[in-house]
Amino acid sequence: MGATDQALEAESKTTEPPKTPPVPEQHDRPFLGRQANLCHLLVLLFSGGLAAITLHIFTSSNVGWRLRQLHHLPTAHYLQTRDEFAVYSVDELNAFKEFYDRSISDSVGSSYSEAEETNIKEALGALRLAQDMYLAGKDDKAARLFQHSLALAPRHPTVLLRYGEFLEHSQRNIVLADQYYFQALSISPSNSEALANRQRTADVVQSLDERRLESLDSKRDALSAIHESSAALRRAKKEAYFQHIYHTVGIEGNTMTLAQTRSILETRMAVDGKSIDEHNEILGMDLAMKYINASLVQKMEITIKDILELHRRVLGHVDPIEGGEFRRNQVYVGGHVPPGPGDLALLMQRFERWLNSEHSSSMHPVNYAALAHYKLVHIHPFIDGNGRTSRLLMNTLLMRAGYPPVIIPKQQRSKYYHFLKLANEGDIRPFVRFIADCTEKTLDLYLWATSDLPHQIPMLIQSTSEAGEGVPQLQSSQMGGGASIPEFHESGSGSLP
């Protein structure tokens, strides 16, 4: 090799570029990028899914909570108390109503437990047998079988409908029949039979209710025509005062007899063998009644403060710390869960507005008073004394309309609570009729005691166990000391025999 060739070879070696590391194949770069993007995407999807699950749980719990709050409010019924009490806006209520209606429909078609299935099968069997007895003309046996079927399946639409039809056509009790049709319709809103039955009975029942109220007005007017100076009227008022306190504390479980109640109120002396609380319950009712007579009857409007003052006197001797104060804890009343303490202020403000509204005051006094009673006891604003305060408020409204304070007999305690339960389930009319019945019996007591009638009528005096205790009893203006008002029985009609 020549010198020139060697020089060129050396030059080529010196000018050769330095070797670089091998470059990865082109398909490796996108793979690494895709791997990173996939990780980012997975993280994003996981975060989004977690957020969605959290939002779903929050929304579901919030809807469930709001629906549970709606359970605190009276359901839609004849007097539409839920709308008047609503804590929420109309849009919220409409939205929740869809969930509420759907939950009712689902509950009707939901699976039953084994015990419930057994009861339903037995109830339907008894129902078929009852219908056979009815068609055979054996109404007494049919009635017992219908009642047995209802006891086994009290919320089965078919049982309610068949028993209602039996009451309507065989027993001629269209009012109670309509009540069962209403209940069946509330459980199964699309039930065509229930709709048809209600269309047939609703107007008739409403007319009967209105005529009943007119009858009460007539008796009230007859009582108002008696001059205040009448000695018989004064005696009747005094006796009714003792009875009212005796029965209203008796509903709450007080075991004092009428004679003992009278003795405590007249002498302020303790009764042996009875608890201090039972004495104090009677004294508290006495204070509350005097407050009504001195202040509330003359007032044009009833305020929250008035209700608190009423309650303060009811519990004044039993629990002076809680008296006149809204409760600060959640309470439970049987199957009813009243609103939480945080809702009480708003609910009571709305109740006060309803209580003094033109719409409410234009109702018949008995309807107005009964509904006020129900609304207040449904809110259950106090830790104790809600029933007594609600009954006192009811009587305040009745007294402002010229009625005497209504006596709800403690012997009818179970009926009283049953009708409140029916009102919670959607139909307040049975409770209003119950109050109307007690109003009529109280009016009859006054009219009989101030009349010259030589005969007696069922009255509200005492339980059978107290008969013969030497309790002073009402006497008519014509009767001698040997004649007294007999015991009141739950089945009494309240009308003159």
Curated annotation (Swiss-Prot):
ATP binds at residues 252, 333-336, 384-391, 416-417, 424. It is a single-pass membrane protein. The active site is at residue 380. The fido domain mediates the adenylyltransferase activity. Protein that can both mediate the addition of adenosine 5'-monophosphate (AMP) to specific residues of target proteins (AMPylation), and the removal of the same modification from target proteins (de-AMPylation), depending on the context. The side chain of Glu-252 determines which of the two opposing activities (AMPylase or de-AMPylase) will take place. Acts as a key regulator of the unfolded protein response (UPR) by mediating AMPylation or de-AMPylation of Hsc70-3/BiP. It catalyses: L-tyrosyl-[protein] + ATP = O-(5'-adenylyl)-L-tyrosyl-[protein] + diphosphate; L-threonyl-[protein] + ATP = 3-O-(5'-adenylyl)-L-threonyl-[protein] + diphosphate; 3-O-(5'-adenylyl)-L-threonyl-[protein] + H2O = L-threonyl-[protein] + AMP + H(+). This is Protein adenylyltransferase Fic. It comes from Drosophila ananassae (Fruit fly). A motif (Inhibitory (S/T)XXXE(G/N) motif) lies at residues 248-253. Its EC number is 2.7.7.108, 3.1.4.-. GO terms for molecular function: AMPylase activity; ATP binding; hydrolase activity. PANTHER family: FIDO DOMAIN-CONTAINING PROTEIN DDB_G0283145, PROTEIN ADENYLYLTRANSFERASE FICD. Disulfide bonds: none annotated. GO terms for cellular component: membrane. TPR repeats lie at residues 123-156, 157-191. Homodimer. Pfam families: Fic. The keyword Hydrolase applies. Residues 302-437 form the Fido domain. It is found in: Membrane. Residues 1-30, 468-497 are annotated as: Disordered. It comes from the Eukaryota. The lineage of its organism: Eukaryota, Metazoa, Ecdysozoa, Arthropoda, Hexapoda. The record marks 252 as: Important for autoinhibition of adenylyltransferase activity. Its main location: membrane. Belongs to the fic family. GO terms for biological process: protein adenylylation.
